[in-house]
């Protein structure tokens, strides 16, 4: 487990219906990785119709953010009848490099950034815009499909499929402090 763990971003925030945070040890219920607590995210459910008319919900969303040049598009559709319902959701996000606002403290300016040369070695490069954190951008797609079937009031069958794919998410946490005399060195 080296570097940042990005599991939580594999869920589109626009498909979340409810969130639960359990503080403290929850490893008995959720396994040894839950020793410090648990974050549960409950995604939207397919909704049945309660009368003879189909229950249809359509949500369309788009967003732009200047801090990361983020472009996000989202669509979800619920089609429910009395005994069976379908929910489909698709999200696409493109995140650019993070950019600090003009009123931010100068301590956070990035005069240099770390990249790799053709030999795979870390090198320090001069940043043309010190307000931009280079190599922090990535892209992502999310797909969610849910089906619910209730043949009678005593039986309910749910099926859920979730697919998420992210582009290369750079290791920004590994950012090494530069020393003008000695080059790069890792924090001790």
Show where each model-derived region lies.
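Flexible loop and strand-edge segments within Gram-negative outer membrane beta-barrel domains
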Residues: 134-140, 150-188
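Outer-membrane beta-barrel strand-turn architecture
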Residues: 80-83, 149-153
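N-terminal periplasmic accessory domains that precede
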Residues: 5-11, 21, 34-61, 71-75
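Transmembrane beta-barrel strands of outer-membrane/channel proteins
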Residues: 60-66, 79, 88-94, 159-163
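Short beta-strands and strand-coil junctions in structured, solvent-facing domains, enriched
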Residues: 25-29, 46-49, 95
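Short acidic/polar hinge/loop motifs at secondary-structure boundaries
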Residues: 1-25, 29, 143
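Outer-membrane beta-barrel proteins
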Residues: 4-9, 61-76, 98-148, 184-188
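Flexible, solvent-exposed coil segments and beta strand-coil junctions
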Residues: 49-57, 117-128, 171-186
């Amino acid at each position: 487990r080296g570097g940042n763990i990005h599991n939580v971003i594999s869920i589109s925030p626009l498909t979340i219906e409810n969130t639960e945070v359990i503080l403290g040890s929850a490893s008995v219920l959720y396994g040894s990785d839950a020793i410090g607590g648990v974050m549960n995210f409950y995604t939207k459910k397919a909704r049945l119709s309660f009368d003879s008319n189909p229950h249809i919900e359509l949500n369309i969303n788009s967003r732009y953010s200047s801090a990361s040049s983020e472009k996000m598009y989202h669509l979800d559709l619920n089609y429910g009848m009395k005994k069976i319902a379908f929910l489909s959701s698709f999200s696409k996000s493109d995140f650019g490099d993070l950019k600090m606002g003009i009123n931010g403290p100068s301590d956070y300016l990035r005069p240099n950034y770390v990249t790799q040369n053709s030999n795979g070695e870390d090198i320090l490069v001069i940043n043309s815009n010190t307000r931009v954190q280079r190599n922090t951008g990535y892209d992502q797609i999310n797909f969610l499909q849910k089906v619910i079937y209730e043949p009678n009031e005593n039986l309910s069958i749910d099926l859920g499929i979730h697919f998420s794919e992210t582009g290369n998410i750079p290791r920004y946490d590994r950012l090494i402090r530069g020393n003008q005399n000695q080059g790069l060195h890792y924090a001790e």
